Amino acid sequence: MDEKGRSLKNNNMEDEMDLKRGPWTAEEDFKLMNYIATNGEGRWNSLSRCAGLQRTGKSCRLRWLNYLRPDVRRGNITLEEQLLILELHSRWGNRWSKIAQYLPGRTDNEIKNYWRTRVQKHAKQLKCDVNSQQFKDTMKYLWMPRLVERIQSASASSAAAATTTTTTTTGSAGTSSCITTSNNQFMNYDYNNNNMGQQFGVMSNNDYITPENSSVAVSPASDLTEYYSAPNPNPEYYSGQMGNSYYPDQNLVSSQLLPDNYFDYSGLLDEDLTAMQEQSNLSWFENINGAASSSDSLWNIGETDEEFWFLQQQQQFNNNGSF
């Protein structure tokens, strides 16, 4: 009997020495999934040997239930799931497997980890026991209603974002229509001006620049230069950039035809105009950036900090005996 017992003990020790520990490999995952797809779940100790895995039955079961099962959900626990966990835990306590039945795709181990890392952490920060009546009341009357508010707010934000997307799409189509109409009006205006010039004997140029045949982007400064015929401080630069573009002769423009509030741009070089524009843009950007920074600092509160603040306020309220 002693020899037989020793042989069985030695065999068990040899089996334990052959077992693998540590992370699973992709090859092991494939073997486990392939075997379960063919033979089903259950009898995990025999399943491990039949599948050719040097793992314990418990290791195979946990690997399948927590990671390889097709319906296992990934990612953070949602607000709705958090609310359901708090509600079910208030009824059944630490019965994680039973709670997991009401959260499809979530494992009992994942729910237990959420409870220990989030709920117990808040209780510790509030310096009270997680199983105390005070903390249970805090969850029931403050934390859970707060979750409901956040769920409703997130739903409203999603609906508003969907409405904004629809409006933006419609507005883009309208903008394209307006641009097309504007281009047509511009062409008609240019055609009428050429006809009027022919009637009154004024020279016209068929190479007049339009948005269609120009290779230079249109800007407000170029418009002012074209219509008011400012003196050219650098003739070589403008002649190289504008090519065959037409500029009216300055001698043909009489000072009597200019309006009284006409500003003489001849005294401003391109450097002055550029400096004025950059200063204006810089002031505008600083104002906007300053407002955004103050707003961000005001609302930059983490989710955990916000929840902890509410729970702390509730605890102070309870300590004063007004709860």
From Swiss-Prot:
Expression (tissue specificity): Expressed specifically in flowers. Restricted to anthers in maturing flowers. Strongest expression in the vascular and connective tissue where the anther attaches to the filament. Not detected in pollen.
SMART domains according to UniProt: SANT
DNA-binding region(s), residue ranges: 44-68, 96-119
Post-translational events: Ubiquitinated in vitro by BOI.
Role description: Transcription factor contributing to the regulation of stamen maturation and male fertility in response to jasmonate signaling. Required for correct timing of anther dehiscence. Acts as a negative regulator of abscisic acid-induced cell death. Not involved in the regulation of BOI. Regulated by MYB21 and at a lower level by MYB24. Negatively regulated by the proteasome in an SCF(COI1) E3 ubiquitin-protein ligase complex-dependent manner.
Effect of deleting the gene: Reduced male fertility associated with delayed anther dehiscence, reduced pollen viability and decreased fecundity. Increased susceptibility to Botrytis infection. Myb24 and myb108 double mutant has a reduced fertility and a greatly reduced seed set relative to the myb108 parental allele.
Main location: nucleus
Transmembrane segments: none
Name of the protein in its database record: Transcription factor MYB108
A Pfam family that the UniProt record links to this protein: Myb_DNA-binding
Biological process terms in GO annotation: cell death; defense response; positive regulation of anther dehiscence; response to fungus
Annotated HTH myb-type domain residues: 16-68, 69-123
GO molecular function: DNA-binding transcription factor activity; transcription cis-regulatory region binding
Compartment(s): Nucleus
Keyword entries, A-Z: Activator, DNA-binding, Nucleus, Plant defense, Repeat, Transcription, Transcription regulation, Ubl conjugation
Subunit (UniProt): Interacts with BOI, but not with BRG1.
Protein induction: Up-regulated by jasmonate and pathogen infection.
Superkingdom of origin organism: Eukaryota
Record lineage: Eukaryota, Viridiplantae, Streptophyta, Embryophyta, Tracheophyta
A GO CC annotation given for this chain: nucleus
